[in-house]
């Protein structure tokens, strides 16, 4: 069995995800999405694994982030700035400046200062 092989090859703890199950859950939510005409956003804090974020991005979801690190991961996974919601309490000055530089769009570079 594939899991037995993985267990023998890995000497440290690891997470094992079932991509098909994740896709099934995403498909279910996307069907609700169409029914209620809403777009889902994935809370990156729930699972910042880049492979999972890539899968979620390719499925049409947006990303909800609360820190510069989560924002970085979301952008690296392919989310467009317009598909990222940056909210939550306790943002540091660095988090805010980072988000402004990466998410704020303006025809004038002077506006970002």
Regions found by a protein language model. Name each.
Residues 104-113:
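Single conserved hydrophobic/aromatic residue that forms the stacking wall/gate
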Residues 1-103:
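A charged N-terminal "starter" segment
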């Amino acid at each position: 069995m594939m899991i037995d092989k993985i267990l023998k090859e890995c000497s440290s703890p690891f997470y094992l995800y079932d991509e098909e199950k994740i896709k099934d859950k995403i498909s279910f939510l996307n069907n609700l999405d169409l029914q209620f005409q809403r777009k889902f956003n994935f809370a990156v804090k729930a699972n910042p694994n880049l492979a999972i974020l890539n899968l979620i991005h390719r499925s049409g979801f947006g990303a909800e982030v609360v820190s510069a690190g989560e924002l970085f991961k979301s952008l690296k996974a392919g989310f467009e700035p317009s598909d990222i919601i940056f909210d939550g309490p306790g943002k540091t000055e660095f988090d805010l400046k980072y988000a402004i530089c990466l998410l704020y769009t303006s025809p004038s570079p002077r506006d970002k200062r």
